[in-house]
Amino acid sequence: MRGIILALLLAIAGSERTQIEPVFSESKTSVYNYEAVILNGFPESGLSRAGIKINCKVEISAYAQRSYFLK
């Protein structure tokens, strides 16, 4: 019985379709703001670490069918 239930659950999970490709509107421009910190060094106490902070703004606009312009 457990085997049948497991097989049914796996079949249901495997048949689910997800859309991986993002969909952007052709009439709108999507704007994303990213912020990241990159640290170098050892995580032990008493040792120095160096790092850099990155800020990024990305604009995505439709260029043609299934083609996009990133700025």
Swiss-Prot record:
A UniProt-annotated Pfam family: Vitellogenin_N
Signal peptide: 1-15
GO biological process, one term: cellular response to estrogen stimulus
Tissue spec. comment: Produced by the liver, secreted into the blood and then sequestered by receptor mediated endocytosis into growing oocytes, where it is generally cleaved, giving rise to the respective yolk components.
Ranges for domain Vitellogenin: 24-71
Keywords linked to the UniProt accession: Phosphoprotein, Signal, Storage protein
Alphabetical list of InterPro entries matching this protein: Lipid_transp_b-sht_shell, Vitellinogen_b-sht_N, Vitellogenin/Apolipophorin, Vitellogenin_N
GO MF annotation: an example: nutrient reservoir activity
Entry keyword Transmembrane helix: no
Induction statement: By steroids (estrogen).
Function: Precursor of the major egg-yolk proteins that are sources of nutrients during early development of oviparous organisms.
Protein known as: Vitellogenin-A1
Organism whose genome encodes this protein: Xenopus laevis
